[in-house]
Amino acid sequence: MKHIRNFSIIAHIDHGKSTLSDRIIQICGGLTEREMAAQVLDSMDLERERGITIKAQSVTLDYKAQDGQTYQLNFIDTPGHVDFSYEVSRSLAACEGALLVVDAGQGVEAQTLANCYTALDMNLEVVPVLNKIDLPAADPDRAAQEIEDIVGIDATDAVRCSAKTGVGVPEVLERLVRDIPGPAGDPEAPLQALIIDSWFDNYLGVVSLVRVKNGTMRKGDKIKVMSTGQTYNADRLGIFTPKRVDRDVLNCGEVGWLVCAIKDILGAPVGDTLTLARQPADKALPGFKKVKPQVYAGLFPISSDDYESFRDALGKLSLNDASLFYEPESSTALGFGFRCGFLGLLHMEIIQERLEREYDLELITTAPTVVYEVETTSKETIYVDSPSKLPPLNNIEELREPIAECHMLMPQEFLGNVITLCIEKRGVQTNMVYHGNQVALTYEIPMAEVVLDFFDRLKSTSRGYASLDYNFKRFQTSDMVRVDVLINNERVDALALITHRDNSQYRGRELVEKMKELIPRQQFDIAIQAAIGTHIIARATVKQLRKNVLAKCYGGDVSRKKKLLQKQKDGKKRMKQVGNVELPQEAFLAILHVGKDK
């Protein structure tokens, strides 16, 4: 056991985690030269296209150190985006240490900080690594200084390496073996294994990634899931070297995969503890704290026949992504679907794309909203995650919106632009600290503004140098209103949005103008209105198409023309009473962009 090292690689987006993993795999000979590819651990095609890591991946390698001993390295490559921070915290729970990778050109960024504190909270040993020293812009001394100033861990002898060229990677491995402690655990104790992650395989059923904390797990053992009390047979188990390799036994302290032929998706939830049926452990391991979704949106299949397969797909996906939340919802405009909760907009985009690709579904999304706390006049508190669930205005005593605490790091020269942006987003400054050339800003900004497009705007005002980390702080009373969209005097529930009263006029007008461009012209006038309660704040009309009924009158009597025009008018009026307006898919997506292109 003293020759096992479990560690994660944590860093900000694009600081070179996945490339460093590639080098480590190469040095330890986990894959042959032929099988090696760039970012070999980003196995989803979505990950490869966007060049980001979405799922944490684990690998087991053997490393022959300079002291002649062979060490078993179990490491987990983690995502860098704030939307997938749950993946990171789960991976860290399975480790004794973490490699903190910092780009020597960019220096410390917000996610570096957030992930590092997560690791330190779990009492892990953090080993700083300065990456990308081959870049002309690299300044490793400044980066090391920043790590000490901002993060507060000793970085005087941080390893300097370049994952791309492979310089210094052997030193990283030596440092790992030296600084990160071996796993603590008792091989003789009853089995306790933590489920870090699981996914659904069409042939094998549920495959789980487990970390054996105490005891050993053998092929053919009867395994008991502690939360449900059900028992399964351990059919196959093994390790990843990124390839799946079968083994007969997983020892204490190891990380490996397990197949128990579980067909039920909820059979072995993530964060649960596995033990042996014949000598069970007394208590379960502490799991993971549940994360609360920050953004909610409705997902609806375009054709209602897909509802069943959509439900199954969501089930399988939520097994793989423990932070996804969903419940059935029905809408008059869109039929049956699900209300889903996500950690952020990127998470939402990824989930939607995964559903469409991996399960061949065609989906419509409604506008994302955050959760509001509403105190009704009858003194009860309800949480509202969709505009259609908001009680009528006269029943609301007060409405509170979620406030996010945003930590931003940026070079000094962009400070002015960023502050202007934060004020525009109704932010309140709580803290500002200078570290050398970097400024750390803390703002309290309404969650609704943060999830909409704050990140994109922050990146563009700071030329990509500013970085952001945010978390939910509290609910705060605010003057929010629901803007309804009426088309020919009928409310369309899927188009409603909740916004601040100050922005409501602007938002309403913009939404109505957008809808006007997207709804095709019909044989009659279509009135598009935005309303708060009964008060109409904006209107646009899509003009009717009409035939020139006077074409056949050459000169002639004016009363004849009047008669023909009146006849046409009456016909249009009758048509308007019975006519239905088909809304194109783009109309629902228009909401997503309201307030973006200022």
Swiss-Prot record:
- InterPro entries under this entry? EF-4, EFG_III/V, EFG_V-like, EFTu-like_2, G_TR_CS, LepA_C_sf, LepA_CTD, LepA_IV
Annotated Gene Ontology cellular components are: plasma membrane
Q: Which GO terms label this protein's molecular function in UniProt?
A: GTP binding; GTPase activity; guanosine tetraphosphate binding; ribosome binding; translation elongation factor activity
Instruction: Say which domain of life the source belongs to.
Output: Bacteria
Q: Which GO terms describe its biological process?
A: positive regulation of translation
Keywords per UniProt: Cell inner membrane, Cell membrane, GTP-binding, Hydrolase, Membrane, Nucleotide-binding, Protein biosynthesis
* Protein topology in the membrane: Peripheral membrane protein
SUPFAM superfamilies from the UniProt entry: EF-G C-terminal domain-like, P-loop containing nucleoside triphosphate hydrolases
Q: Where in the cell is it found?
A: Cell inner membrane
User: What catalytic activity does the UniProt entry give for this protein?
Assistant: GTP + H2O = GDP + phosphate + H(+)
Q: Any idea of its EC number?
A: 3.6.5.n1
Residues that hold GTP according to the record: D14, H15, G16, K17, S18, T19, N131, K132, I133, D134
Q: Look at the named UniProt entry and state the broad enzyme category this protein falls under.
A: hydrolase
Positions of the tr-type G domain: 2-184
* Record's function text: Required for accurate and efficient protein synthesis under certain stress conditions. May act as a fidelity factor of the translation reaction, by catalyzing a one-codon backward translocation of tRNAs on improperly translocated ribosomes. Back-translocation proceeds from a post-translocation (POST) complex to a pre-translocation (PRE) complex, thus giving elongation factor G a second chance to translocate the tRNAs correctly. Binds to ribosomes in a GTP-dependent manner.
Give the record's family classification: Belongs to the TRAFAC class translation factor GTPase superfamily. Classic translation factor GTPase family. LepA subfamily.
Protein name as annotated: Elongation factor 4
Q: Which organism is it from?
A: Serratia proteamaculans (strain 568)
Lineage of producing organism: Bacteria, Pseudomonadati, Pseudomonadota, Gammaproteobacteria, Enterobacterales
